[in-house]
């Protein structure tokens, strides 16, 4: 059913984006592959989420989980994690990696909108990291994430700001100069300003708690969290 809905365009997914990530799926867990940046920022993302939401014992949903890098680390922190994605190959890789790691994650092929209709107000924590800039309708994604969170639950989004600096760093720098990412990974027109994401979230019934920037130092090759939200940023909300 889901495959037919994807094909006929009734699901909030960009088929070109889906195929792009499917082609790279076998490399998700290679820390020196195209997914190296995700491996490097994962401890920062995990620490930030855990600091706010205290993951141990919580029911957590990871939206757009891909190969499961964040999902598994949240499971290792003591959470009961469900990961959803629409990429068949990414989900297969995620499930296979569980056999190696021994972690427990419930992976499902589902859109966030479909799961919100099935399990409203079900999760203590909802994460949607590095996904909003890849979907045709981010407003729909934000609304569904809000619907999935329990009252008082936490919802986290990370994405890329839209301004000349983010174009220079996230597109030109990351994809063409430093070769951190494959060319064509990002579409500048899909980048989202923090003010825009904040408005989407407020309209979905979420209350903003914090926005924090995530920066890359090309000299030290180290990522860090700080006040600079000009390029990558994370926003934390309560339902």
Swiss-Prot record:
One of its GO terms (biological process) is methylation. Pathway: Cofactor biosynthesis; ubiquinone biosynthesis. It is an enzyme of class 2 (transferase). It comes from the Bacteria. S-adenosyl-L-methionine binds at residues 45, 64, 85, 129. The keyword Metal-binding does not apply. GO terms for molecular function: 2-polyprenyl-6-hydroxyphenol methylase activity; 3-demethylubiquinol 3-O-methyltransferase activity; polyprenyldihydroxybenzoate methyltransferase activity. O-methyltransferase that catalyzes the 2 O-methylation steps in the ubiquinone biosynthetic pathway. This is Ubiquinone biosynthesis O-methyltransferase. It comes from Nitrosospira multiformis (strain ATCC 25196 / NCIMB 11849 / C 71). The lineage of its organism: Bacteria, Pseudomonadati, Pseudomonadota, Betaproteobacteria, Nitrosomonadales.
């Amino acid at each position: 059913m889901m495959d037919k809905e994807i094909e006929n365009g009734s699901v909030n997914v960009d088929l070109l984006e889906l195929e792009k990530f499917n082609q790279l799926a076998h490399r998700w867990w290679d820390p020196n592959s195209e997914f190296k940046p995700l491996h490097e920022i994962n401890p920062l993302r995990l620490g930030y989420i855990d600091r706010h939401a205290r993951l141990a014992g919580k029911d957590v949903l990871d939206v757009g989980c891909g190969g499961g890098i964040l999902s598994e680390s949240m499971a290792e922190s003591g959470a009961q994690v469900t990961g959803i994605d629409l990429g068949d190959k990414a989900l297969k890789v995620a499930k296979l990696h569980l056999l190696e790691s021994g972690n427990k994650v419930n992976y499902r092929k589902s859109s966030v909108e479909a799961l919100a209709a099935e399990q409203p107000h079900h999760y203590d924590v909802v994460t949607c990291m590095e996904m909003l800039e890849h979907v045709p309708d981010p407003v729909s994604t934000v609304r569904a994430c809000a619907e999935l969170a329990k009252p008082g639950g936490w919802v986290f989004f990370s994405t890329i700001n839209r301004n000349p600096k983010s174009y220079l760093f996230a597109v030109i720098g990351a994809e063409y100069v430093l070769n951190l990412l494959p060319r064509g990974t990002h579409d500048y027109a899909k980048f989202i300003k923090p003010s825009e994401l904040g408005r989407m979230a407020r309209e979905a019934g979420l209350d903003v708690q914090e926005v924090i920037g995530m920066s890359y130092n090309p000299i030290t090759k180290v990522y860090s969290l700080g006040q600079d939200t000009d390029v990558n940023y994370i926003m934390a909300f309560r339902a």
